[in-house]
Structure formats: structure tokens, C-alpha cells
């Protein structure tokens, strides 16, 4: 039950202020008992704590940040606005409600039925120095998780607690989002 003072290892659930949280602590070696930061069993952990969407949010975008010698970790973004604000300058967001954007996200709705839309592309520098435009986010930078901490990596539409439908491509790239009227 955790109050015996024994070191915890592997996956474990810890009760903090009446709420249960899932953790992963290293099992062996010099880091035995240390909280894992990174991926384990298709889920991500920050300082041992499972990165998952809150029950009210249902789905949340997670940003991986790695600033040399300063910060490294996974940060949940509160909502679609925070997600767009966190995108680096190499990303582009088209928010025009037009048929091309509905098609880009695979939405079979009438334009009048869409209240808000965002289609995400990014510039990627090729080895020869040319710039290629790719659809969606880099999965090493941004990914979508559900309330159990599972990374959404299949082609799907996932509605968060604010009625934003996040569109994810096979492989986990976030292509954008939309809100229906």
C-alpha cells in the first residue's frame, strides 16, 4: 500500500491526496527506483508519472521539449489554442473554412457545419537543403494521448472535452482539428 517506506520499482499506482496516479520506476541498475522520463510500453512518463489526458479533457496534446542543458520533458497542453501557440515557426496553420481544408482532414461535412478548423503543415529541410512541406506534426515533438495514457497513433478523429475533434494520421501525426456547429 506504499506507506511501508519500501522503494517502488516497475509500474505502480500511488495514491496522492486521495487520487491514484500511475508511475513507472526503473527496475535495475544505477537508476533503480528513479522515475522514468520517456517512453515505456507505448506510454510516456514524466519523472515517473504517466502522461495522460485528464478525465474532463478526454484527449490532450503533449509536447516534448528538449532544450540543451535546461529542460527536457513532456508537457500537456491545456487546449487547442495552447497547442497552436506551442507550434514552432517551421509549422503553418490554415484556419480558413474551405473545402480544401475539409478534404485535407478527411472531413465529410458541409462547410456550413464547421465552426472552426485548423490544418497543420510543417517545413522540413531535406539533406540537399531543399524545403519540403509535410502534413501534420512531427510525432517526436507533439502527440495526442487519451485518459489511459495511450498515444493515439492510428488514423482517427478524437473529440476532446471542449468538442474539438483532433484528426490524427496513421503513425500519430496530428493533422489538425475542427469544431462542428
Predicted feature locations:
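Extracellular adhesion/carbohydrate-binding repeat motifs centered on closely spaced tryptophans
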Residues: 1-181
